[in-house]
Amino acid sequence: IFGFFQSIEDSDSQLFQDLTIRDTDIDYDIVYVNWDNGTDYIQRNAYVLEEVIKWVNERKAVAGSTEPNVVLGQSMGGLVARYALKDMENDTDLNHDTSLYISHDAPHQGAHIPLGILHMGRHIVNEFIQTPLGNINIPINGTGSYGLSTIDDILDAPAVNQMLINNVDTNGNRT
């Protein structure tokens, strides 16, 4: 959560800072959800979000609040939030009590990574894993180093496979 607050402070947005980290007259409760496994199936993370929304609604009822929820989903979180809200709408026993859903930069029509990049990633992993060098680290744009198995794990993650329009398996076959 420290990283979340730090990113708010670094945002240079006075309004955003007032809403989230400063004591002002603006009266909002912000519930920030960070997934233990963000690359798990979108549906599974949506079910977790449904539980969070139910918890929030229970707390609001105890406090006597009638304010509806505002749900913001960023990137893949937009897909998770959309799925959770629609799933709750489809269940007549559940009420998400949400007046506004904001989707920011979410790949609602799928994500596209050029096939050449996917093939290259798989090829590099396969070439180096099959050599006596073992698992080496590859620097990625100043963000540190990632092991080759990390590249494989990311490309094989359930959510990545759900979002990608085209994908390449470990043998280089399109899926």
Residue positions per predicted region:
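Short, surface-exposed "cap/lid" segments of acyl-processing enzymes
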Residues: 1-27, 32
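Catalytic nucleophile-loop/oxyanion-hole region of alpha/beta-hydrolase
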Residues: 35-51
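Active-site loop/turn elements of alpha/beta-hydrolase fold enzymes
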Residues: 28, 33-37, 106
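Serine-dependent carboxylesterase/thioesterase catalytic core
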Residues: 46-175
